[in-house]
Amino acid sequence: MARYRGPRVKIVRRLGELPGLTTKIPNRNYPAGQHGPSSGMTKMSQYRVRLQEKQKLRYNYGVSEKQLLSYVRRARRMKGPTGELLLQMLEMRLDAVVYRLGFAPTIRAARQYVSHGLVTVNGQAVTIPSYQCSVGEVIKSNSAPIVEHAKTFGGVVPSHLSVDKNNATGKVERNVTRSQIGLTVNELLIIEFYSRK
């Protein structure tokens, strides 16, 4: 299955705030659908809780099920806490770094900027949104929309990144830690969800 292209506010209403998916804010605070307002009365199963946590991660970072499973398997092979390593790998993707630097309003927009060749890494054009950024790499763009958004960006840039808003240039200073990730998700439930795969 390809990336999700459907209504984004519906997903936000169901799963909660996803800053990488959309900047829109839903008018209603209950899930969409015929049984939306009354669905809060039912007890959520253990499977549903884990599935929703996984879906939060998928929709926020715009990755497919196959990609997320690949990231989980790669995180399992690495030394350290699997959940934190998974989030670190997702957060160090080029599209996520471009979004965190304030060059794009959402990760989806950052993905499009990268795939259209508007972003360079260490002076080389990179058109792969899943490119894993490493410490010391410089991300730059000369595109007018990106430079304009970077200048007007009012959000907080995480401390593992440094940014020059006037030149639309950013640098990865160090690896991201769990406290610097702006997504409220329980990564242990995601690892438990994938424990049988």
From Swiss-Prot:
GO terms for cellular component: chloroplast; small ribosomal subunit. One of its GO terms (biological process) is translation. Transmembrane segments: none annotated. It comes from the Eukaryota. Belongs to the universal ribosomal protein uS4 family. PANTHER family: 30S 40S RIBOSOMAL PROTEIN, SMALL RIBOSOMAL SUBUNIT PROTEIN US4M. This is Small ribosomal subunit protein uS4c. The gene is rps4. It is found in: Plastid, Chloroplast.
